[in-house]
């Protein structure tokens, strides 16, 4: 259908006028709603309009800031059960517990521990060179069947609560199970018919390469477990190469041991947690940091000479002798004695 030109012009004008009228009416409606909003009163029954309200009138309560309270008490715990916040290492004087102690008389071990005063150092052997754990480890290797590992964890927690300084002893590079299951981490036989196979010491244990990534990751996992369990310090014993044997190692032994110690110390030690090393000689270049050097099988007559060979700072604090007698020549340095010695040494204290 054709619409004449004149008719189209009229329709266009009518449409423009209608659109303008709609826009004006919409603007008037919007302004009216905004103006009306000031008179709307909301109640439980709904909304009503009250034209008697003033636009300046405030309804409700004006919020004011709460006055500062001055009657809040602060409790300062300065008693014997207060937790020490000191980050400084102090000289150790305490006792050690072997795996055999716990196997033979676990209840007797616990009874002796109850007599020890807060801040006494207690070292607990929590893993043997075979690879058996004496705490509830999640590494996947065997847990002890001779000792209740959950009871050991409970004992550790009790010592921590009582304020004793608790140290875990773990073989670092001597581990039969881990070596057997991770052949590339172990020291190989150097010559002969079985060259390249895992080397085993006279006690039947495999030894691990100190700088091997698998070895260091395994030790890191163990240390983190022990830290979470509540230990203040972990001693990595057997932190050395075997003294002799037909094994092959092409690296610099001294440099690699130091490198392993520095790596573990840097990644694991904190202001409140120490990583220490059980070494074969006091000449070991112990890295600076929150760590100690532990020496075993040092006769009382050799204490002075052994300590003189150490090149570490604060030797009276960072050098610890694991002794088997009550000889007082050890007391100038850190010393840990068999727990049985506490029957005499703690008497009257």
Describe each region flagged by the PLM.
Residues 107-133, 225-237, 290-293:
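Catalytic domains of carbohydrate-active enzymes, especially glycoside hydrolases
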Residues 121-123, 147-198:
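Glycine-rich, aromatic-flanked loop segments that form ligand/cofactor-binding clefts
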Residues 96, 165-174, 235-237, 255-299, ...:
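Aromatic-lined carbohydrate-recognition surfaces of secreted/lumenal glycan-active proteins
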Residues 32-40, 44-46, 290-349:
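Substrate-binding cleft of secreted/luminal carbohydrate-active enzymes
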Residues 73-78, 84, 128-171, 244-274:
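Aromatic-lined substrate-binding rim segments of carbohydrate-active enzymes
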Residues 15-33:
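Hydrophobic membrane-insertion alpha-helices, especially the h-region
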Residues 1-14:
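N-terminal Lys/Arg-rich, disordered targeting/topogenic segments
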Residues 83-100, 173-224:
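Active-site-adjacent "subsite" loops/lids of carbohydrate-active enzymes
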